[in-house]
């Protein structure tokens, strides 16, 4: 029986993971569930899956969770220490940690899991973006197992030879092709993007996701973060990662080999598929997802990304080229910018403007510890907030 901690169980990834686990309760036992503030859903999840521990990062939500579970006579223990996430991620009775917390908040507990040699199913791409070198080093030193949940990176893993490590050199890979839907504004003009509203940006054509990642998909920053993530996961330079727009989201990524072969993973756009493969890797288990109907699909289209219209993708490549703390700055500025856009404090196009400003303003420096990473993250956020104060649409 594999014991699992889900960091971020009330989000899209967490909910989908629990759906897959529910199909295989003979194989997987939920050891702990954590969330930020969605106490009602977390209460329901605890009632159904009966984890040994639960924790809500929001203090008021955590107190309410205690009351809710007490009223249900639940045996689940609600933790209240500020280090509870790290403690759960490194707990000796935990085999597997699903890292599904959105943003920089997931960095420390995911690092704790890596340092403890856990099997890490990684959905929190920010860990690799912010602290890729440190995280990969921790995984190797502790002999932890790292399996991506992101559909694109999971697809790459599926078409790599099983016997090889996640390394492009040893697999005869020429390049990786990361597919992107193009988001809701793929056919919009640059002029039209000036007037985009949060409501419009949250209408993703293919995927049902959380707000932050949906906005990232609309700006194509999500794909930029995935390029950075792929560099660390597969030890491949950015020059050998190509982004291809594929509106149908049926092909989740492709790998081109040196012999001229190109292998792709296809499937309906449903996160339960990569989650199921991550859980059972290298074997396969039922996910609850229907098979792909190629006749109904009819066609698969591809096009190059427009970097002029979607500059966030280019900024991610720029961060990789600069190296050092640049990806950390990129990520922090983007998180602040997305939140500001959702509050209608800045425009859609100002998201990229803010990120570029921060990347130019913060001095390059090496990252030798998680503390240094967090310092850069904090400094960038303060700078970004100051920029917003000067450009705030609501002020």
Language-model segments: what does each one mean?
Residues 1-395:
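Catalytic, metal-anchored helix/loop core of enzyme active sites in primary metabolism
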């Amino acid at each position: 029986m594999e014991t699992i901690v889900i960091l971020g169980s009330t989000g899209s990834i967490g909910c989908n993971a629990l759906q897959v686990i529910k199909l295989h309760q003979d194989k997987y036992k939920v050891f702990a569930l954590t969330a930020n503030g969605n106490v009602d859903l977390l209460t329901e999840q605890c009632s159904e899956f009966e984890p040994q521990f639960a924790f809500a990062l929001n203090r008021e939500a955590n107190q309410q969770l205690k009351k809710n579970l007490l009223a249900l006579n639940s045996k689940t223990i609600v933790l209240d220490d500020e280090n509870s996430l790290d403690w759960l991620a490194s707990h000796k009775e935990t085999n597997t940690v699903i890292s599904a917390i959105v943003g920089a908040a997931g960095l420390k507990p995911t690092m704790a899991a890596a340092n403890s040699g856990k099997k890490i199913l990684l959905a929190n791409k920010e860990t690799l973006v912010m602290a890729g070198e440190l995280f990969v080093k921790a995984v190797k030193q502790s002999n932890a197992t790292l399996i991506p949940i992101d559909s694109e990176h999971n697809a790459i893993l599926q078409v790599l030879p099983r016997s090889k490590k996640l390394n492009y050199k040893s697999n005869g890979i020429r390049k990786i092709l990361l597919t992107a839907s193009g988001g809701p504004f793929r056919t919009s003009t640059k002029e039209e993007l000036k007037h985009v509203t949060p409501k419009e940006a949250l209408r993703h054509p293919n995927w049902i996701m959380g707000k932050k990642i949906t906005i990232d998909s609309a700006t194509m920053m999500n794909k930029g973060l995935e390029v950075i993530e792929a560099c660390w996961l597969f030890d491949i330079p950015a020059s050998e990662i190509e982004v291809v727009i594929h509106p149908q989201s049926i092909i989740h990524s492709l790998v081109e080999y040196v012999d001229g072969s190109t292998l792709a993973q296809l499937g309906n756009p449903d996160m339960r598929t990569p989650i199921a493969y991550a859980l059972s890797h290298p074997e396969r288990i039922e996910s609850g997802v229907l098979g792909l109907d190629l006749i109904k699909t009819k066609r698969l289209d591809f096009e190059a990304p427009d970097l002029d219209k979607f500059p966030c993708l280019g900024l991610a490549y720029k961060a990789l080229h600069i190296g050092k703390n640049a990806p950390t700055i990129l990520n922090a500025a983007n998180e602040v910018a997305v939140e500001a856009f959702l509050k209608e404090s800045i425009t859609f196009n100002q998201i990229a403007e803010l990120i570029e400003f921060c990347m130019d303003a913060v001095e390059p420096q090496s990252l030798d510890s998680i503390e240094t990473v967090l310092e850069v993250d904090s400094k960038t956020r303060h700078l970004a907030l100051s920029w917003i104060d000067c450009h705030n649409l609501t002020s």
